[in-house]
Regions:
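Ribokinase/PfkB-type carbohydrate-kinase core domain
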Residues: 1-11, 61, 72-87, 99-140
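Glycine-rich phosphate/adenosyl-contacting loop at the front of the ribokinase-like
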Residues: 1-61, 66-70
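Residue-level signature of transmembrane alpha-helix interfaces in integral membrane proteins
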Residues: 25-26, 30, 95, 112, ...
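Thr-Gly-centered strand-to-loop micro-motif
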Residues: 32, 39, 95, 137-138
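Short secondary-structure boundary/capping elements
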Residues: 37-44, 89-92, 116-121
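Short, basic and Ser/Thr-rich N-terminal targeting/leader segments
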Residues: 52, 78, 91-94
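Generic internal hydrophobic packing segments that stabilize the cores of diverse globular domains
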Residues: 68, 72, 94-96
């Protein structure tokens, strides 16, 4: 059975770096590898939900900044449908830098989160929950 989920919350552009050791103060480290992907709690949950054969719809602030195209492209490749709460927003989307220590999987994250990406709830269509089996709100 395929479920349909609505995922509501933060979308970021994540720069994820794999490092052989954690960063220390005043240290510069060359990464072993990196990824640039759409991220954020609701976004990651939508991608995972879709990966397991379900249909995910993401309700979030995306906007029209050039960096947003990277987010939209990644979500499209993952099969996640999006509803943009502020499609005309031209500001830079929230960006996260994540350093993952290869040996342990421990990570350090710095991000602005949704501080500058608050949406007006009146934009949401009244029939948004039609044919939705599951709703996730990430708190952002």
């Amino acid at each position: 059975m395929t479920y349909r989920g609505l995922f509501v919350g933060l979308t970021t552009l994540d720069f994820i770096y794999r490092s052989d050791r954690p960063l220390q103060a005043n240290q510069k480290v060359v990464a072993q590898d990196y990824l640039t992907v759409a991220g954020g709690p609701a976004t990651n949950a939508a991608v995972a939900f879709n990966y397991f054969g379900n249909q995910a719809k993401l309700l979030s602030v995306l906007g029209k900044h050039p960096l947003t195209e990277l987010i939209k492209s990644d979500l499209s490749q993952q099969g996640v449908a999006t509803i943009d709460l502020i499609p005309d927003k031209s500001d830079t989307p929230p960006v996260s830098s994540i350093v993952v220590t290869a040996a342990t999987g421990e990570r350090s994250i710095i991000s602005l989160n949704a501080v500058k990406s608050q949406a007006n709830p009146e934009i949401v269509a009244p029939d948004l929950l039609t044919n939705i089996d599951l709703v996730l709100l990430d708190g952002h």
